[in-house]
Amino acid sequence: MQRSLKNEKSYRNLFLIAALYDFILGFVFFAFMRFFLEGIFKLPLPLYPAFFQAAAAFVFVMGVGFYFVYRNMYRNIDIVKVGIIFKLFYTGLAFYYVFFGGMPWIFSVFGFLDLPFIVFFIFFLRAVGREVQA
């Protein structure tokens, strides 16, 4: 069954942006953690850098997932659901720890940057749901 979503090209382009954002963010923090933490953000390195790098690697992998969605939105719709959960958890944790737990404020910036993606992903799922029911 061939499906076609209204504004499909716009949705596809936004998934490409989401993929590139997570690819770049994950790669940069994985490969250049010391430079960004100590050099740019003036933060000490974490006691166990592998935990930070594992999180960065997961962000990169989510970029791969969003690229799959870009390539075929209908076959990979469950990746969008995982993306919403992933970004909600990061945003919630970042905001909580910035405001209540002493986490450096810079990490909330990425939470704010994730908010439009969360909204976009939800709009996409609702639009696909309407198309399936129609």
Regions found by a protein language model. Give the residues of each.
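Juxtamembrane helix-break-helix junctions at the cytosolic face
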Residues: S4, V64-D78, V98
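Membrane-embedded alpha-helical segments of multi-pass transporters/permeases
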Residues: F27-F30, Y67, F95-V98, V119-L125
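Membrane-helix boundary connector in multi-pass membrane proteins
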Residues: T91-V109
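Membrane-helix boundary elements
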Residues: E8-A50
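Non-cytosolic membrane-interface motifs at loop->transmembrane helix junctions
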Residues: I40-P49, D78-K81, M103-L113
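Membrane-water interface at the C-terminal end of transmembrane alpha helices
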Residues: P116-A134
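Core segments of alpha-helical transmembrane spans in multipass integral membrane proteins
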Residues: L20-F30, L47-Y70, V82-F89
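Short, Lys/Arg-rich, polar N-terminal cytosolic tail immediately upstream
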Residues: M1-E8
